[in-house]
Every structure is written in structure tokens, then in C-alpha cells.
């Protein structure tokens, strides 16, 4: 679970925040960065952040689970989540046809929240060529120095984790499986 502790938080006190959307809202509110100052545009950013938190992220998580980790292949679940993933990519592509970034001409926390979920589009079974606005947006964001730095840090962490960074979750121990999925590991 993503979490931060701001040593100089609310009222100058240590403040802990968990969940990525809450962290992004907190940091943008505190710094005034990556969120518009006028309420109308701010609400648009909130809407797209919530779209990612409640729809895009969870549905793509289900695609990954049923395609790659479920001990039994369930055709209905695979088809249902693949169709929903494709639909959501279409929604995002349509939105991105209106501007350089998710909510228009400015890079915001909505872009920050959505981009990582598109990293594994091929593994999600998505043909990115069918979504040209997403492809353009991804390229634009990948050219940002901060995004490049984030991916460098991710690669460093993965390298440090070595064997612990298991790409096939079926290789997890029973205890690791229980912590991740909340159930006993299937035989």
C-alpha cells in the first residue's frame, strides 16, 4: 500500500497519508503544483483521478489477475475484464483527443495517476496502435525528466530486489500468496 509521512504536515505536525490518490491530492494541495488553481478545472482533475482510482486501475488489475495469476482460467472473467479494459482505454483515448494531457493543456496529478497503469498495455492484451492519443500522450510523458527519473528508480529497486522480484506470482510461497490475495494458495 502506498503511504507517506510528511514530517512538516498539517499544522506543522507529522502527517501520514495512504493510498496513491490521497497522496497526490495532499501533495498537490500542499504545494499548489500539478493541480489547477481555479475550481472548475480542479474538479476535472479530481474526476479523472477518481476515474483511475475507481475504474481504470481496478479493472486493469483484474485483467492481470485473470490472465496471468488465476490458478484456473475462467473464460467469462477473462473476456469480461478484457472488454472493460479495452472500453476504458477507449474512454481515455477520446479524452486525450481534446488536449495534450488528460485534463487539457496542463500536466496534472491525473496524468501521474493514470500513466503507470498504461505501462503494461501489451501484457494487458491492449493493442496501443488502436489508441493513438494514448500512444502520443505516453510518449510526451516519457520525455519528461521526472517520469524518466521515476522509471530509473523503479529499475534500481527491481535490480536490488533480484530474486524477491518475482514476475510469476505463481512462484510465491504460501505465506506470500496469502498476504497478496487473502486466500490460501491453490495447489
Task: For the regions a language model picked out, list residue spans one by one.
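GST-like domain detector, emphasizing the conserved glutathione-binding G-site
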Residues: 1-83, 93, 178-187
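Alpha-helix/helix-capping structural signal
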Residues: 22, 145-146
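Alpha-helical interaction segments
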Residues: 16, 38-41, 107, 127-128, ...
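Acidic/histidine-enriched, glycine/proline-rich intrinsically disordered or flexible terminal extensions
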Residues: 154-187
Amino acid at each position: 500500500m502506498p503511504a507517506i509521512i510528511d514530517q512538516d504536515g498539517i499544522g506543522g505536525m507529522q502527517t501520514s497519508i495512504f493510498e496513491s490518490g490521497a497522496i497526490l491530492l495532499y501533495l498537490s494541495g500542499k504545494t499548489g503544483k500539478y493541480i489547477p488553481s481555479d475550481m472548475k478545472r480542479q474538479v476535472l482533475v479530481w474526476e479523472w483521478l477518481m476515474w483511475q482510482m475507481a475504474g481504470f486501475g481496478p479493472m486493469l488489475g483484474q485483467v492481470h489477475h485473470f490472465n496471468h495469476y488465476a490458478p484456473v482460467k475462467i473464460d467469462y472473467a477473462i473476456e469480461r475484464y478484457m472488454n472493460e479494459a479495452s472500453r476504458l482505454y477507449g474512454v481515455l483515448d477520446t479524452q486525450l483527443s481534446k488536449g495534450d494531457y488528460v485534463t487539457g493543456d496542463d500536466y496534472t496529478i491525473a496524468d501521474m495517476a493514470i500513466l503507470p497503469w498504461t505501462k503494461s498495455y501489451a501484457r494487458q492484451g491492449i493493442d496501443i496502435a488502436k489508441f493513438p492519443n494514448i500512444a502520443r500522450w505516453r510518449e510526451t510523458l516519457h520525455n519528461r525528466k521526472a517520469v524518466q527519473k521515476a522509471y530509473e528508480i523503479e529499475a534500481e529497486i527491481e535490480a536490488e530486489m533480484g530474486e524477491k522480484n518475482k514476475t510469476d506470482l505463481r512462484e510465491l510461497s504460501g505465506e506470500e500468496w496469502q498476504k497478496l490475495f487473502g486466500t490460501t494458495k491453490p495447489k
